[in-house]
Amino acid sequence: HSVDISRIGVHFHESMRPEDIAYRSITTALSDLAGMGSFPSFISIALTSDIEEISWYEKFSKGIKETLDEFSIDLVGGDVTKGELNISVNVFGYPFKKPILRNGANLGDSIFVTGQLGKAKQGLNDLLNKKDSIYCKDFLRPKPQFQKAKELSDFATSCIDISDGLIKDLGDICKQSNVGAELCYEDIPILNDHKDLTHGDDYELCFTAPSHLDDQIKSQGFFLIGKIIQKLGLLVKKDGCEITFEKNGWDPFE
């Protein structure tokens, strides 16, 4: 089970279509299940809104149904109240094998990501600049990585979805596992630059696995980006030198 809150002006822009707001609000919540090696079964939605146009709610409901159909899940309940636009989504699911937690990383494990980072950041930038690009959909309609979660359930020792930025989310694994991490910048699949590591909204997965499985895991299309080390903290090296970041990732209270 997981719960996510999406708020206007924070998690989505007021200019977005109601269908996209519904889709994004649900799929970003579903992604937490993928990050636990699980698949979704049903959800509930609580909507706070002061929008008066009936057509907005019709389109929002259409977006909900579209999302339910795509992921073969049921809506089992919810609530509506008046106030600033705010959507709370509770998601429930079951593990593909067993739950993959954030506290299972072991010293010497390899660190992987399931796909390229930074596309949603580029998409948001393009949307704000009224530029139509192939990356807009990465922000408007993020895809939870359930198929990849199923595949990595065979070997992952820990896992998390990259919602707040790789540096922050991998940092959570390190803290809960009482280990550190060392990453090779050149091996991380990013779209633009180092800011792709801290922006978030990627909804790819970051996971750890025993290093003797490196070749097998890479052959499945996953990206080896570093290793778990004993020294606490997270180190990113580029050309042998450490990279520092202005911030580690998304902060909901900023």
Language model feature labels by segment:
Residues 6, 39-125:
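Glycine-rich anion-binding loops of enzyme active sites
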Residues 121-138:
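Short, compositionally biased
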